[in-house]
UniProtKB/Swiss-Prot annotation:
Annotated InterPro entries: DEAD/DEAH_box_helicase_dom, Helicase_ATP-bd, Helicase_C-like, P-loop_NTPase, PriA, PriA-like_WH, PriA_3primeBD, PriA_3primeBD_sf
Cofactor(s) for this UniProt protein: Zn(2+)
Positions of the UniProt region annotated as CRR: 431-485
Source organism phylogeny: Bacteria, Pseudomonadati, Pseudomonadota, Gammaproteobacteria, Enterobacterales
Protein name as it appears in the record: Replication restart protein PriA
Alphabetized UniProt keyword annotations: ATP-binding, DNA replication, DNA-binding, Helicase, Hydrolase, Isomerase, Metal-binding, Nucleotide-binding, Primosome, Zinc
Organism the protein comes from: Klebsiella pneumoniae subsp. pneumoniae (strain ATCC 700721 / MGH 78578)
One GO BP annotation of this record: DNA replication initiation
Region (Helicase lobe 1) residue spans: 200-375
Amino acid sequence: MSVAHVALPVPLPRTFDYLLPEGMAVKAGCRVRVPFGKQERIGIVAAVSERSELPLDELKPVAEALDDEPVFSTTVWRLLMWAAEYYHHPIGDVLFHALPVMLRQGKPASATPLWYWFATEQGQVVDLNGLKRSRKQQQALAALRQGKIWRHQVGELEFNEAALQALRGKGLAELACEAPALTDWRSAYSVAGERLRLNTEQATAVGAIHSAADRFSAWLLAGITGSGKTEVYLSVLENVLAQGRQALVMVPEIGLTPQTIARFRQRFNAPVEVLHSGLNDSERLSAWLKAKNGEAAIVIGTRSSLFTPFKDLGVIVIDEEHDSSYKQQEGWRYHARDLAVWRAHSEQIPIILGSATPALETLHNVRQGKYRQLTLSKRAGNARPAQQHVLDLKGQPLQAGLSPALISRMRQHLQADNQVILFLNRRGFAPALLCHDCGWIAECPRCDSYYTLHQAQHHLRCHHCDSQRPIPRQCPSCGSTHLVPVGIGTEQLEQALAPLFPEVPISRIDRDTTSRKGALEEHLAAVHRGGARILIGTQMLAKGHHFPDVTLVSLLDVDGALFSADFRSAERFAQLYTQVSGRAGRAGKQGEVILQTHHPEHPLLQTLLYKGYDAFAEQALAERQTMQLPPWTSHVLIRAEDHNNQQAPLFLQQLRNLLQASPLADEKLWVLGPVPALAPKRGGRWRWQILLQHPSRVRLQHIVSGTLALINTLPEARKVKWVLDVDPIEG
């Protein structure tokens, strides 16, 4: 009898064997319902064979086959199989992650009826001026008069569901549902919107990509902020859609704005589907199916849209390719950018990686000849670059982390009826210990790196060599007792600014204040209306948002990036600074950027200010080569957590011994730790980690694979929660 090897969404790196009943035929990639323990579960057939490691009479039969054909396309299936192996993650978890929720639940892989809004007869004739007191209702009814609006697309528009419900209450709009009809956009395809005239650099980029349209090619589109990268994407898509092929456009979580989506919808007379967190399960399945059967011409989405099946994919675009949100930080820790390149190679199509501040790994791949670079160096509209200033904080009396000079400049810009942005980049920065009076930083005597401050354990610790020392009472350089951790949080800053600027509306935009659905849009709308004059934010604010009245931008905790134990923090700061500089001074207003630091002479600041991001990247790549850090080497991070701060370090020490005893290990394998994680305690659990480094990615993969096969033999393995992160981007 045939045996189905079934992947289930459980944290075990294996498949489970079931007998296929007489007459039941399934293929790899089809869903089945199987008995598992005392219940039935949905599984995915990974393979079918005639044998099992267990006696056949001990196997249970498959209860039901749910699909005649695989739910995955051939290329996505190959991608997922490879990714499960590369990231050492359970195959069942990987396969289920790539499916819409309704398919995970066993629902049919077919379209369900969708709801849409339409204008009633009264709504078609009523005077729109009667709604002028409610701008959103007026906008909504005007849009409905142009045609029906699918309910799942309301979040992409300038009005909201509440406005439509209000119109419904007045008898001007109504809801109905219908099964989406299979439509072919290709016969009526045209470019609907206005084309902008491409400059020479843009035209060269479009031509180069078009010349390689029939094979794999990876292009870095490096363009300064405001240089017109989106127009290049649109022109490339124009060529792809004209051939009847489809396009996948990936954007960071925060970049999926109504304005971005509108640009694509207005340009093409072809269906654009958007995959984002605001969709309900049936809407997400509908968009997924439209891509699979070829109905969707363009899919725009965040990280997980990478796994969408397409009937005939012609190009992949990854906007802001350096953005850290492309790396999944929970569960299966994959990097969508890296997997997208793998997929493009498998599909034999071009991929475009766009950024004003390319990741060092991407620039390294250009140097290695794996990618080709296209550069856009001219800013659209000849906007003037912002004026840049560095404020030395040493010995200055600070209020809420702000120097007197910065507070004075803020007052001047606010009095001119402009807006001010204050940036904090706390995410991923490890705190260092700094003397406020002379600028001394606690430095490890054995390494060329800075101690990380661990307040809870009352000590300084080096995350490179693991040496530690007590927190000093006074500065060894000047004797001052004014020793402070570098950095301040957005919440404390908001509270401290209120008494300094009592009449000025303040808006804080970070993950805490925008976690509720629609909250980010509400904050941004308030900013555009002029309702908030001071904006406090993290990197979320730096990405692509156009604030015409912002003329002053300040980065407050620069030292946190310059002296972090995380070797990537300088790169992240350089990217943030470059993006932020583009936020100040648009719409004909002169912008100003102010950096606050205790170390104005720092080489990184000097390079960034006077030579720009490209020069910084050259310098940073050279430094990483000297220190043998990625991209010159490969990393795997293994983190363990416990409740008592004892089992996790013990487990990791046992694991370290196992790794170093591996017959595959050689003198080039470098292991750091166990050391406390940069955030040593979260949710009541203590976190420890070890970092593995090797110049050969393939060799490191073999070492890790061999060790993981033995990990459950370790005495502490079942007493801790542990995770493995291949190519980690955060320490």
